[in-house]
Amino acid sequence: MSDKKRINQIAKETGLSNTELVATAQSLGFEVKSHSSSVTAEQAEKIIQGVKTGTDTIVKPAEKTVKAKIKTVPETAKSKQEDHPRTFAGKAVVEDPAILARIKEKEEAKKAAKTEAEPIEEVITTEKPKVAEPVKKSEPKAAAKAEETKVEKVEAKAKTVTPKAEVKTENVADKKEPVVTEEKKKSLTQKPRIQIKVIKRAEDIKKEQAAARPEKKKFDKNRNDRNNRNDNRRPNQNGNGQGHSQGGNHYDKNRPAGQGQNQGQKRDKFASSGSSSTSDTFTPAASGKNNRRDRDRKKTDSNRDNTKDGNRKGGPLRVNDNRNQVRNARNSNWNQKGGRGRYQNNQSSSVPATQRKFHELPESLEYEVGMNVQDIAKSIKREPAEIIKKLFMMGTMVNQNQSLDEDTIELILMDYGVTPLKKVEEDKSDIERLFVEDGYLNEDKMVERPAVVTIMGHVDHGKTTLLDRFRESRVTEGEAGGITQHIGAYQIKTNGKKITFLDTPGHEAFTSMRARGASVTDITILVVAADDGVMPQTIEAINHSKAAGVPIIVAINKIDKPGANPQRVTQELTEHGVFPVAWDPENGSEFVEISAKFNQNLEELLDTVLLVAEVQELKADPSVRAIGTVVEARLDQGKGAIATLLVQQGTLHIQDPIVVGNTYGRVRTMTNDLGRRIKEAGPSTPIELTGLSDVPQAGDHFAVFEDEKAARAAGEERAKRAQLIKRQNTRRVNLDNLFDTLKEGQTKSVNIIIKADVQGSAEALAASLQKIEVEGVKVDIVHSAVGAISESDISLAAASNAIIIGFNVRPTGLAREQAAQEEVDIRLHSIIYKVIEEVETAMRGMLDPEFKEEIIGEAIVRETFNVSKVGTIAGFMVIRGKVTRDASVRVIREGVVIHDGAIASLKHFKDDVKEVGNAQEGGLMVEDFNDVEIDDTFEVYKMVEIERKK
C-alpha cells in the first residue's frame, strides 16, 4: 500500500460507500472534497474507524451552529446496524454493551436539552414521515430516529447541541443524504426557533387534548370524511415513527377517525405539558399558537407541507394524498348525481342534479315588431317552451323561430306582468332632419361663419361682369396662373372677413335647390341696370328670393352710362315689394349704386354684405360631423364623380365616410376654389371632392357618418327609396284633384303663377283671385308677370307646386315639353271671370270632368249560341266602324234600346281578340245579358273626355 490512498480505493477495500467515507473525513477535519481526494494511511485508518464506531469521539468546535453540523454529519446504514440494537417482535436484542452505553448517554443528553429549551418561540416541524411501527421505550433505535425530526437553532449552547448532531441518524434504506433546503434555511434564520419533542403516553395525550380543546368552527364535513377515509386506508410507511396526518402524529389503528387531524390542529394546546421518555407516541408542539392557527385556516394541507420539506420526506406522500382527495371528491360528486346507467345509485338525492337559477322579470321591455319567441325568452330570462305553452293556451300556435306581430308580443308580455314598450327606430338614412333639427349642435362651440351670397338678376344687367370683378379682386399678382378652375363657388376676403359667393348662371340651379328644400343662400344681391330698370327676370329673381326667405341687397349697376336713372329703378322696385331701408327700416333692403365695369363702389357693396351678415348673426358649430349641400356635380373621365359641396355645419376631413344625396363614398381628395388641395373644410367653405360612388344632383344634401359601413347602408337605402318614388306616379296639384288634396290636408293654400299680356290684366287677375276664400283656404300668388309662359315659369311652378294661369298668352314649345315632364298644370283663359269661377269651383270640389259619347262601330247579329254555364254568344257581322273589347254596347231591337252594358268577351272565330274590324265576323257576349236574338243591332261606343275650351 502506498503512502496515500484515494477515498474510492478505501471504499472498494472496506465495502463502505464513498459518501460515508467523505462525510466522515470531513467531520474529522481532513481536507477531503470528493471520492477522488487522497488521504494518508493514518488518516484512512481513522476514517474507517470513525465510520465503524460512529462519530461519538469526534469533537466539534463549540462555535459551529447546528445548521452546519447537520450538513457535515453523515449517517450510513452500516453504522446504524452496528450502533443500534436489532429488534425482534418489538423487543431489543442487545449485542454490544458499548452501544447500549452510548445510547444511554444520548438519552441523558436529550433530556438535558429539553429542560434547557425554555425561550422557544415556534416549532419547526419536518414533513410528514413515512408510516412505521409503534416506537417502544426499550428501543434505542426508535429513540435515535426521533432525534432525526428535530431541526434546532441553538443560540449560545453548543455543548448540548453537539451530541445531538453527532448521534442524529437517518434511515437511508430508501433515501440518500439529508439536504437542508433554502426554505428551511430561511425559516431557521427568520426567528429563533427550536423543536421540542414531548414524549408521553397516548392515553395521556388524548386526555389532555380533550380537556384543552376549545370550541371552534367545524371544517367541511365532506372534506373531513374523505381525509379520514384516506387516513384509515393508508398504512404508516415512514420509518421515523410519525404519521402523515396534519399533526404529524403516530398512526394508531385503534384511535378514532380524524384524530390525527385534530392532534395536528391542536398540538399547541399540549405543547407546554412537559416531556416524558416513557410514552409510546410523541407529538411535536409549538409556541405562537395564534399564528399557527391562522396559517392552518388559510393554507391547505399540501401547501403547508410543500413549504417545509415536502421534496425530502413527506412530499411524495402528500402529493399522492392530494390526488386521492381530488379523486374521492369527484367520485363523491358522481355518486350524488346518481352515477350512470344501470350502475347508478338507486338512493334518491335530496339535492337535484341541476338546479335552475331564478331570474326576476324586468318591469318593462322595449320590443320590436317581428321579434320571435326565442328573442322574447332571452329578453325576459324564460324558456322558449314556456312562452310557446302560454301562447298555445291562448289559442296561438307558434314555434320559437316564428315572427310575432305587435299584438301577440304585447299580449305575452302583459301576461308575464311586463310593461311592453314599442321601440322607436331612428331612420339614419334621413339626413334631411339634420338641417331642420339643431339639437345635436353645441351652443358653447358655435363660431361666426362666412355669409353665403348669391348674385341674381337679368342677364344683360352686368351680373357676369360683377362676378368677374369679385374674382379678380381676390387673386393676388404673385399667383402663378391665376384662377385655375371654376367650381361654381368661391370665397373672397375683405376687411379680415370671408364671403362665399355662389355662381348661379340663370335660375335653374337655384330653383332646383328650392325644390329639394335646400336654401343655402344667406343673402341675395339683385343686380338691376340703371338704364333699363326693372325687367321680367328681375321680378322673377325678386320672387325667388322672397320664396327662399333671404334678405335682398339691390345693386344698381351701370351708373356710368349717360341714360342711367337710379331713382326710377328704386321707384319700380317699390312697386314689386322691394323698399329701401330709408323707407322701411324694419323690412327694407339696402341699395348700392355701383359700376362693375369701372370697379366703382364695389368695396361699399362688400361692406354692405358684411353689415347684413352681421345683423343676421350667422354662426355654425365646427366640432360636429359635417353637413351641407351640393352646388353642382359632374362626371370626369379620369377622376370619376366630382361634386362641388358647400359645408354648412361641422368640419369635413379627408377619408370621412359621406352620404351625398342617393350616393355614398369616402372623401378621397378635397380641392378649394383656388385649385389647391386641402385636408379639412369648415363651415361656409366651398370645396370640390372625389370618391363618390355616383354623380349626385345639384341641391342634394350630404352628411358625414361614423363609419363607412353605416354610410354604405344609408346610401343604398336612400337610392332604393328614390327608385321606388320614381316608379310611382307623381301627384301634382291641379284643378281636378285640388279638392282631394285639400281634403287630405296636404295643402292649405293654392299657389298660382299668373302670366298676362299686359300688366293691368295681371294685377286685376291677381287681386280678384286673392279675394277667394273657401273653407279657410286662400289663394297665394307666387309669381305674376307679363309675357309668354317660359321654361323658368315651369321650373318655378314645379318647385312651389303651383298652377300656371295664362291670360291671353300661350306657352312656348319648350315650356310645353317641360310642363309635360314636370307634370305642371297650365290653364289658359281670355275672360277674367271664367278664371275666377274655375278656380273657385275647383276649390269647392265642384269641378267634374266632362265626357261625350263617341260611336265607334255598328254590327248585326247573324246567329246566337247558348252555352251552358256561360251564357248566350252572339255571332255578328260588322257593318260600320269596328268593335273593340274595352267599349260599351247597346242592344237595339226594332229601333228600341233593350240593353246598355259592357262587352264581356270578344272572339274572332276561336281566338280572343281586342278588336274586330269592318266587314268582319266575330262573336261577343254582353255582360249580364243573354236575351240576344237574330237581327238585333249592336251599337258600339266609348265615353271620351271633352277638352275644356281655352
Swiss-Prot record:
Region (Disordered): 128-354
Binding site for GTP: 457-464, 503-507, 557-560
Listed InterPro entries: EF-G-like_DII (IPR053905), IF2_II (IPR044145), IF2_N (IPR006847), P-loop_NTPase (IPR027417), Small_GTP-bd (IPR005225), T_Tr_GTP-bd_dom (IPR000795), TF_IF2_bacterial-like (IPR000178), TIF_IF2 (IPR015760)
Cellular compartments per GO CC: cytosol
Record PROSITE patterns: G_TR_2, IF2
Source taxon at top rank: Bacteria
Any GO molecular function: GTP binding
Annotated spans, G1: 457-464
Start-end of Basic and acidic residues biased regions: 128-158, 165-186, 200-234, 291-312
Region (G5): 595-597
Name of the protein in question: Translation initiation factor IF-2
Lineage: Bacteria, Bacillati, Bacillota, Bacilli, Lactobacillales
